[in-house]
Amino acid sequence: MPALHLLFLACLVWGMGARTAQFRKANDRSGRCQYTFTVASPNESSCPREDQAMSAIQDLQRDSSIQHADLESTKARVRSLESLLHQMTLGRVTGTQEAQEGLQGQLGALRRERDQLETQTRDLEAAYNNLLRDKSALEEEKRQLEQENEDLARRLESSSEEVTRLRRGQCPSTQYPSQDMLPGSREVSQWNLDTLAFQELKSELTEVPASQILKENPSGRPRSKEGDKGCGALVWVGEPVTLRTAETIAGKYGVWMRDPKPTHPYTQESTWRIDTVGTEIRQVFEYSQISQFEQGYPSKVHVLPRALESTGAVVYAGSLYFQGAESRTVVRYELDTETVKAEKEIPGAGYHGHFPYAWGGYTDIDLAVDESGLWVIYSTEEAKGAIVLSKLNPANLELERTWETNIRKQSVANAFVICGILYTVSSYSSAHATVNFAYDTKTGTSKTLTIPFTNRYKYSSMIDYNPLERKLFAWDNFNMVTYDIKLLEM
């Protein structure tokens, strides 16, 4: 440590202006290298005594100690300042980050609120536009109905005049009674304006379809001369009667049915329903009574061993017949024993959107029931999209006979079979659709029809015929409805 003090003193003296410093190095007696630094005093011409030198050295040591203490104090203050600065900087950064996070959170909330407002605005605009379109459509429909009403009134007035003219000119009175004339028959017989014959005559004179003015019986079905039994051609479809409305989005479309040939333990009131929105359709709701069905309280829920596809299922003779999902296989599921009794592929049948009805929904294979039994409606590549109709054996699902029609399956909304005749519906969404084609399996011929058919809820995804009740069952946009029909002998 004293050597360092001497070196410091030498440097200090040299730094104060000494310009005659000498530096020398040489080996001492032991061979070690020694460095010698010589500086001339600027004020003293001769060296002081030894005691004076020691006093000067001590003064220098005291000054050095004081300077060292000042240096250490300065270093401590610098370290304190650096620590304080670091803390201040860290606090400022932390505060800035917290402020930034808070601002970003508020900004995100504002953005979400803005997006919600924009979405609500778009929804309101879309709803408003839909209302405007519906309003325009209703106004147009109202105008058409008013025009039709006026035309009908004019035609009825014209027909009344024609009937009056016929009354006057048909049977002129005679002065002398004929021998074949019964007493009281001299006057012209009066028309009974309430009879079915007069209504049919008036409809012919006014070119109004008879189905629009025929009187109905209390059950809502027009009177037909063949009664409630026997087969005939479809000539009239009534207005839909709504029995039930589905509660959830899964009921947008589906299938509901009653067994036209019920077996124990089921009755004519037993009803089944399947909601077919989704990809894994296995639940079948069973209702023992019609009132349970209308109120929505199933007595049992079947879980099918394999998923079904679309709205083509039917119930016949105690079994549920349906198309297996993503396949051309028809499955017979016995409801009482809850077991699969038969499975059969329909040769070449399109499936899973290959040849559906016009509304889509994977309606490639559609099962149907009429007075003669079980049918399947489909199409094939060989038929080039035309409807193919096959009669099925209900026990083993073997194809008994097949007919290829000239009706394109994708051009019609749905189809059903009555008395061996295939009927198609023109539209699933138009409120005023028609039964537009008929194919007779007895003659192998088809013809066009214009029987009015009402899609009240404008999305009919299923239409089936029940030969026991002589009604059409349909599923129209969440709603399960029935239609009365009229058949005439062929």
Swiss-Prot record:
Q: Which cysteines are joined by disulfide bonds?
A: 231-419
Coiled-coil regions listed in the entry: 69-170
Q: Could you say which residues are annotated as the site Cleavage?
A: 212-213
Gene deletion effect: Mice lacking Myoc are viable, fertile and show no significant differences in intraocular pressure or clinical signs of glaucoma. They also show a reduction in cortical bone thickness as well as trabecular volume.
Keywords, in A-Z order: Calcium, Cell projection, Cilium, Coiled coil, Cytoplasmic vesicle, Disulfide bond, Endoplasmic reticulum, Extracellular matrix, Glycoprotein, Golgi apparatus, Lipoprotein, Membrane, Metal-binding, Mitochondrion, Mitochondrion inner membrane, Mitochondrion outer membrane, Palmitate, Secreted, Signal
Task: Output the GO biological process annotations, alphabetical, semicolon-separated.
Answer: bone development; clustering of voltage-gated sodium channels; ERBB2-ERBB3 signaling pathway; myelination in peripheral nervous system; negative regulation of cell-matrix adhesion; negative regulation of Rho protein signal transduction; negative regulation of stress fiber assembly; neuron projection development
Q: In UniProt terms, what function does this protein have?
A: Secreted glycoprotein regulating the activation of different signaling pathways in adjacent cells to control different processes including cell adhesion, cell-matrix adhesion, cytoskeleton organization and cell migration. Promotes substrate adhesion, spreading and formation of focal contacts. Negatively regulates cell-matrix adhesion and stress fiber assembly through Rho protein signal transduction. Modulates the organization of actin cytoskeleton by stimulating the formation of stress fibers through interactions with components of Wnt signaling pathways.
Describe the subunit structure.
Homodimer (via N-terminus). Interacts with OLFM3, FN1, NRCAM, GLDN and NFASC. Interacts (via N-terminus) with MYL2. Interacts with SFRP1, FRZB, FZD7, FZD10, FZD1 and WIF1; regulates Wnt signaling. Interacts with SNTA1; regulates muscle hypertrophy. Interacts with ERBB2 and ERBB3; activates ERBB2-ERBB3 signaling pathway. Interacts with SNCG; affects its secretion and its aggregation.
Q: What is the name attached to this protein's record?
A: Myocilin
Provide the species name: Mus musculus (Mouse)
- What's the source species' lineage? Eukaryota, Metazoa, Chordata, Craniata, Vertebrata
In the UniProt record, the gene name given for this protein reads Myoc
